């Protein structure tokens, strides 16, 4: 995608076509399989064959940059992939994309020296999971506030090793398929080598430590445990449990980001994922629109004409369509701008934040509008609407909640003395 054109390039069109095929032929059938299980953990484990197909189809390798041996393309292509998958089967898709988020810190800060950590994800074999282990049971929205408690998961230097201690929650894939740890966890933690008390900028102490499944096995039983599996109303095959690291020792080479660099890389990872959450929202809106449109064409609710000829129904449906188109345009623009500009990084980042906030909140409204249009029939579980709503309601509150994190980051940008409001569209004003 270049200039102002919205025509997909041959590469982008091929990505979309391949994604649509994968969604229909691999993701869609997985739903019936995992829904046959009653517990959340069992549903997650039931998606392993689907995930393995994603691995063998290079969907995991494609989430790593070419500089690291991957086949990753542009962020616009990633957004196209995410939309196609979320329009069909969000839950099984999220496990795939969460590994991409787990690998993003390495895309930002990794180098060839990290080849051993990346090898499982480049092989095209098995079902390796990665996770960005960020959130904590008590929340982290204000973890960088001076004078606050900060991240409660800590790392302490002891000789040639770092010792990781603490509890995390909501980190998709972090427990692995057998709940004994994933192949690679990028654990965001606070350096306490010089003690718990620190009066400076909390960012100075934030670091990212790589914890592999091999590290956990070397540390022995009890070093990693699942405290509780979280049952969720949507994304019902996704695993993001409450976990605990108990004095997990890793070698110094496992430090991806030393103290002082971890926050920038962690939030940089979430800048990229913000765009993809925008695409998730578009996928959900698209599914809601398509389902409501199909209903309106075949059902008259006892009247003489199909519902689509009723003004009230058409108004709600056209609203969903307009919001979906607007959200997609913003998402594509944010994806292109984050990698290409114009504007400095803050200007480009603002668009990513806007795409996440607008699209995620619009997706919730689109689902409720579709439900209101269809009426009580939408409450039937044989209809897709309740599941779509349960999928949508997490989009504004995960991957950095809109209220506690994403809007606050936009506020910080606007408060900056160097804020240049339209630089991401027209370039720097000066």
State each model region's role:
Residues 8, 224-325:
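Glycine-rich beta->alpha junctions and the first turn(s) of the following alpha-helix
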Residues 52-119, 123-127, 178-182, 338, ...:
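Internal helix-loop-helix
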């Amino acid at each position: 995608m270049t200039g102002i054109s919205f025509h997909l390039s041959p590469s982008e069109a091929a990505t979309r076509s391949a994604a649509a095929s994968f969604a229909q032929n691999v993701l869609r059938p997985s739903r019936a399989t995992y829904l046959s299980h009653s517990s959340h953990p069992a549903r997650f484990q039931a998606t392993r064959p689907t995930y393995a197909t994603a691995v063998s189809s290079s969907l995991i390798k494609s989430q790593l940059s070419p500089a690291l041996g991957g086949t990753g393309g542009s962020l616009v292509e990633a957004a196209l992939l995410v939309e196609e998958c979320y329009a069909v089967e969000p839950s099984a898709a999220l496990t795939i994309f969460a590994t991409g988020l787990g690998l993003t810190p390495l895309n930002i800060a990794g180098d060839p020296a990290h080849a051993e950590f990346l090898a499982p994800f480049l092989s095209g074999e098995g079902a390796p999971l990665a996770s960005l282990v960020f959130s904590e049971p008590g929340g982290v929205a204000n973890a960088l506030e001076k004078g606050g408690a900060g991240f409660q998961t800590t790392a302490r230097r002891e000789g040639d090793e770092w010792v990781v201690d603490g509890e995390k929650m909501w980190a998709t894939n972090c427990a692995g398929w057998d709940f004994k740890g994933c192949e690679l966890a990028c654990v965001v933690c606070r350096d306490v080598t010089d003690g718990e008390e620190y009066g400076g900028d909390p960012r100075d102490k934030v670091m990212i430590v790589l914890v592999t499944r091999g590290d956990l096995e070397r540390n022995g039983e009890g070093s990693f445990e699942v405290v509780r599996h979280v049952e969720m109303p949507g994304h019902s095959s996704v695993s993001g449990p409450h976990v605990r690291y108990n004095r997990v020792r890793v070698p110094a080479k496992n430090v991806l980001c030393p103290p002082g660099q971890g926050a920038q890389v962690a939030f940089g990872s979430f800048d990229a994922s913000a765009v993809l959450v925008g695409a998730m929202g578009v996928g959900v809106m698209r599914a809601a629109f398509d389902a409501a449109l199909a209903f309106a064409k075949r059902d008259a609710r006892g009247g003489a004409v199909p519902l689509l000829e009723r003004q009230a129904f058409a108004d709600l449906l056209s609203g969903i369509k307009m919001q979906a188109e607007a959200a997609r345009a913003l998402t594509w623009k944010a994806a292109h701008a984050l990698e290409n500009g114009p504007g400095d990084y803050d200007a480009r980042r603002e668009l990513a934040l806007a795409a996440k906030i607008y699209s995620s909140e619009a997706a919730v409204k689109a689902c409720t509008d579709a439900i209101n249009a269809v009426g009580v029939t939408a409450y039937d579980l044989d209809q897709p609407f309740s599941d779509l709503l349960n999928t949508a309601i997490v989009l504004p509150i995960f991957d950095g909640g809109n209220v506690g994190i994403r809007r606050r980051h936009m506020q910080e940008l606007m408060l900056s003395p160097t804020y240049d409001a339209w630089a991401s569209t027209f370039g720097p004003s000066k």
